[in-house]
UniProtKB/Swiss-Prot annotation:
Subunit: F-type ATPases have 2 components, F(1) - the catalytic core - and F(0) - the membrane proton channel. F(1) has five subunits: alpha(3), beta(3), gamma(1), delta(1), epsilon(1). F(0) has four main subunits: a(1), b(2) and c(10-14). The alpha and beta chains form an alternating ring which encloses part of the gamma chain. F(1) is attached to F(0) by a central stalk formed by the gamma and epsilon chains, while a peripheral stalk is formed by the delta and b chains.
Subcellular location: Cell inner membrane
Domain of life: Bacteria
Role: F(1)F(0) ATP synthase produces ATP from ADP in the presence of a proton or sodium gradient. F-type ATPases consist of two structural domains, F(1) containing the extramembraneous catalytic core and F(0) containing the membrane proton channel, linked together by a central stalk and a peripheral stalk. During catalysis, ATP synthesis in the catalytic domain of F(1) is coupled via a rotary mechanism of the central stalk subunits to proton translocation.
GO molecular function: proton-transporting ATP synthase activity, rotational mechanism; proton-transporting ATPase activity, rotational mechanism
Name of this chain's protein: ATP synthase subunit b
Family designation: Belongs to the ATPase B chain family.
Keyword terms, alphabetized: ATP synthesis, Cell inner membrane, Cell membrane, CF(0), Hydrogen ion transport, Ion transport, Membrane, Transmembrane, Transmembrane helix, Transport
Gene Ontology cellular-component terms listed: plasma membrane; proton-transporting ATP synthase complex
Native organism: Chlorobaculum parvum (strain DSM 263 / NCIMB 8327) (Chlorobium vibrioforme subsp. thiosulfatophilum)
């Protein structure tokens, strides 16, 4: 403790020494001049180059962002056009399918009406043929019956027997 008291009384560490201050300032100025002459230029130029590089990177980033936004806008427009085209194609396909379906339905109806008309005509012709055949058979039966009646004079029992014989003959011919 005694030594620390002596240092404090004789000026010590905290008391300013004008000679030391002067030489410290001179040394600082010399170092500053040397640094300015030797190192300041390269440091400043390096900082300027760094600043230019950063600014260039920022500019490139802005340009890339603008290009990306432009491409995105074009892509959205192309997608919208593609969607519109797809909707148009789908709509046209549905319209075409509806048209084809209605044409096929109409053709089928016309064909079915033709087939029905042809079938009715064929049935009518068969009916006429059957009636003609029936008329001919009835006429033949009437002629044969009249012929038999004329050949024989019949009483009621004989007439019934002749008619039954004729009916049986006709039935046998049909089968």
């Amino acid at each position: 403790m005694l030594t620390s008291g002596i240092i404090l009384l004789s000026g010590g560490l905290l008391s300013p020494n004008p000679g030391l201050i002067f030489w410290t300032a001179v040394t600082f100025v010399i170092v500053l001049v040397i640094l300015k002459k030797i190192a300041w230029g390269p440091i400043v130029s390096m900082l300027e180059e760094r600043e230019k590089g950063i600014q260039s990177a920022i500019d490139r980033a802005h340009t890339a962002k603008e290009e990306a936004e432009s491409i995105l806008k074009k892509n959205k427009e192309m997608l919208a056009k593609a969607d519109a085209e797809a909707d148009k194609i789908i709509r046209e396909g549905k319209e075409y399918a509806d048209k084809v379906r209605s044409e096929l339905t109409e053709k089928a109806q016309v064909e079915s009406q033709k087939m029905i008309a042809a079938a009715k005509e064929e049935i009518e012709q068969e009916k006429r043929r059957a009636l003609d055949v029936l008329r001919n058979e009835v006429a033949d039966m009437a002629v044969k019956g009249a012929e038999k009646i004329i050949r024989t004079t019949l009483d009621a029992d004989k007439q019934k027997a002749v008619v039954n014989d004729m009916i049986n003959e006709m039935a046998a011919k049909r089968n």
